[in-house]
């Protein structure tokens, strides 16, 4: 989309479609459009408290204990956070994550290289062959306005990722379970006013509180 405007009875969304410009009207606009959410930015709904950066490769040949998750810490491989090796059947996912302000000008790939070349543990990585790689931001900390009149944010766009592991699927489903029953009832009556949405967004206060507690514990131990 390149435009979205809230009216009393609907949201008007304009977008580039396969046949040119298209205009769509909807009762509720759901922004489930990721860490760089256009919906969140367009409506100035706030930013996640922090955005971590994760880099992960999938490898064969990792010399770890069968069925066991390995975690590695250290400022040279994941400053302020940790790295991991997670078995997934025939392959292992090896990754590292941190925050941009802790990276001292290095890239996520460089930190992962440090992990793979660490003299204390590199015997586990000697036979590894990379088969895939993934990199991206991990937004954590529920945004200031997850719901406004006729607009709701979900998942990464709302900043629901766990501050301890970066996981977003579980919290995303939990957010859906919390909000959708109320939103569905309100949509039946087309009652999605600012006051109503503010009331529904209060359901996320406990999630935000848990994020703050877990972030404090993470920062205390890593």
Model-derived features: where do they sit?
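Predominantly flavin-linked oxidoreductase catalytic cores and closely associated redox partners
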Residues: 1-123, 139-143, 159
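FAD/FMN-dependent oxidoreductases across multiple families
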Residues: 3, 103-183, 187-188
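Generic, low-specificity signal for short hydrophobic/alpha-helical stretches with a mild N-terminal bias
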Residues: 24, 37, 67, 133-136, ...
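Short, function-defining helix-loop hinge/capping sites that tune catalysis or transport
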Residues: 41-42, 164, 214
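Noncatalytic linker/hinge segments flanking ATPase motor cores
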Residues: 68-77, 94-101, 127-141, 174-177, ...
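A broadly tuned preference for mixed-charge, low-complexity surface segments
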Residues: 73-90, 136-155, 204-219
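C-terminal helical "tail/cap" subdomain of flavin- and related membrane-associated enzymes
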Residues: 181-222
């Amino acid at each position: 989309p390149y435009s979205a405007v809230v009216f009393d009875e609907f949201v008007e969304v304009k977008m580039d479609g396969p046949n040119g410009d298209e205009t769509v009207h909807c009762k509720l606009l759901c922004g489930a459009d990721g860490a760089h959410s256009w919906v969140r930015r367009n409506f100035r709904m706030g930013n996640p408290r922090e955005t971590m950066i994760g880099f992960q490769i999938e490898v064969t040949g990792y010399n770890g204990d069968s069925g066991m998750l390995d975690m590695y810490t250290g400022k040279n491989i994941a400053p302020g956070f940790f790295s991991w090796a997670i078995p997934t059947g025939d392959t292992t996912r090896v990754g590292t994550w941190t925050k941009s302000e802790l990276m001292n000008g290095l890239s996520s790939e460089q930190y992962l290289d440090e992990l793979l070349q660490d003299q204390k543990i590199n015997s586990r990585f000697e036979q590894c062959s990379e088969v895939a790689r993934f990199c991206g931001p991990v937004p954590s900390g529920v945004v200031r306005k997850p719901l406004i009149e006729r607009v709701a944010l979900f998942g990464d766009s709302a900043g629901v990722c766990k501050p301890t592991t970066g996981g977003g699927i579980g919290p995303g489903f939990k957010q859906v379970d919390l909000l959708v029953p109320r939103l569905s009832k309100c949509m039946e009556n087309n009652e999605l006013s600012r006051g109503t949405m503010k009331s529904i967004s209060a359901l996320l206060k406990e999630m935000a509180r848990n994020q703050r507690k877990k972030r404090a514990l993470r920062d205390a131990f890593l």
